[in-house]
Amino acid sequence: MSNEEINIHEAEEQLSEQEMLRRQKLVELQEAGKDPFDVYKVERTHSSADVKDNFEELEGKEVKVAGRLMSKRGQGKVVFADLADLPGKIQLFIKIDNVGEEALKEFKTFDLGDWVAATGEVFKTKMGEVSVKVTSFELICKSLKPLPEKWHGLKDPDLRYRQREVDIITNPEVKDTFIKRSQIVKAIREFLDNRGFLEVDTPILSPIAGGAAARPFITHHNALDIDMYLRIATELYLKRLIVAGFEKVYEMGKNFRNEGVSVRHNPEFTAIELYEAYADYNDMMEIMENMIAYVCEKVNGSTKVTYEGTEIDFTPPWRRITMVDAVKEFAGIDFNEIKSDEEAQAIAKEKNLEFPKPLDKVTKGEVLNMLFEEYGEDKLIQPTFLIDYPVEISPLTKKKRGNEMFTERFEGFVYGREVCNAYSELNDPIVQRERFEQQAREREYGDDEAYMLDEEFMSALETGMPPTGGLGIGIDRMIMFLTDSSSIRDVILFPTMKPQK
């Protein structure tokens, strides 16, 4: 016996009784000249929704529907069955008088999960359900694996994420979530396109991982014999396009960060970044709050949504609060009174704050930010712009007009979670180089999420970038709120999973 034959034999031994029975049915169909895998195309005339929505027009007329067989009921001379397609499901009425004895017998052998095409007349049953009175049908794909038990579906979260296709088949609300995700993405593009933004594509592979403070994925380009990074943000390339003369640009796509997995984080995620010449962070606040309101109205019909039992109101304007005021409100510490790094370090020690470098190297601004994360972040339930971040943690941002310890940067928070990040973009190449050099020192202290120096970006900045506002939004997190999903994995079709052994 060859190795291939041994492997096939071992695989067959692992099949369940139901799987073996389904494979036997397939063999019988093939021997009878009815191989479902020989079907190449189905001339479907209507979806389930088409039939139901246009019943008055279609009543008594012939249609051809197709979908997955989800239920069968009845014995003897009549069988009722439900076919599921993307919009929903349609009931089939199969009667011996209409299809013949042999055909009815054949239909009864079909398994739940099989794909069927059926032709027949549209009518309503005595119970008032729009149905198709079948005159002919065809098995167009044989399901060799049984679906999860009807009334329980696929409930184990780990299995749901690993077998998303089965999750969608058995849990209609999951399908609805991803349809809504598509609608949300479409509405975002629509909003920006209507404002004159140009959608662009920039590299995913880059020799520098820039534009954000994050740990990158590293790969190797064999032909060039260089290490490259999967992008952690699109920022630097998009700013180079502003230098080139494009005045309003955006990109929606995948970013990659080699970090942990949680209900809020997936290493591969969808984000949008947009940049507008001659604008500042105030303009970005206006764009953010009005775009989300537009999307909510478009997709949900209201700017108010319910998330985990709490009503969230996205109606503009959102609350604005400085980081200093937030720390004063939630931690009871007034940083206007803190005059030195040493004073801030003493507070950090008292509060047991942890940093990725020695405490004596930590600055006042870094302590302020950490205090907000510890005491204030989870308090911002309604949509809020946290504005004016310390300069030390905002290396790509212009300094605050009138207060050079801070920058014109904001992050948007909803339900205690960051959903966006925006700047009045730093366009002074001399200051930008100084900031990058400081970030290089941070890497020496052990902060592997500090920014890398990108000389190509610096060259572009030296060519000249006009005053610019920039905004980045985590699409997956926004979709969580608009679909009332508790985990980011619930809004990503195939989230990152540890391989099964």
From Swiss-Prot:
One of its GO terms (molecular function) is ATP binding. Its main location: cytoplasm. Its EC number is 6.1.1.6. It catalyses: tRNA(Lys) + L-lysine + ATP = L-lysyl-tRNA(Lys) + AMP + diphosphate. GO terms for cellular component: cytosol. CDD domains: LysRS_core, LysRS_N. It is found in: Cytoplasm. It is an enzyme of class 6 (ligase). Mg(2+) 2 binds at residue 418. Binds 3 Mg(2+) ions per subunit. Mg(2+) 1 binds at residues 411, 418. One of its GO terms (biological process) is lysyl-tRNA aminoacylation. SUPFAM superfamilies: Class II aaRS and biotin synthetases, Nucleic acid-binding proteins. Its cofactor is Mg(2+). It comes from the Bacteria. Pfam families: tRNA-synt_2 (PF00152), tRNA_anti-codon (PF01336). Keywords: Aminoacyl-tRNA synthetase, ATP-binding, Cytoplasm, Ligase, Magnesium, Metal-binding, Nucleotide-binding, Protein biosynthesis. Belongs to the class-II aminoacyl-tRNA synthetase family. NCBIfam families: lysS_bact (TIGR00499), PRK00484.1 (NF001756). HAMAP family: Lys_tRNA_synth_class2 (MF_00252). Homodimer. This is Lysine--tRNA ligase. It comes from Clostridium perfringens (strain 13 / Type A).
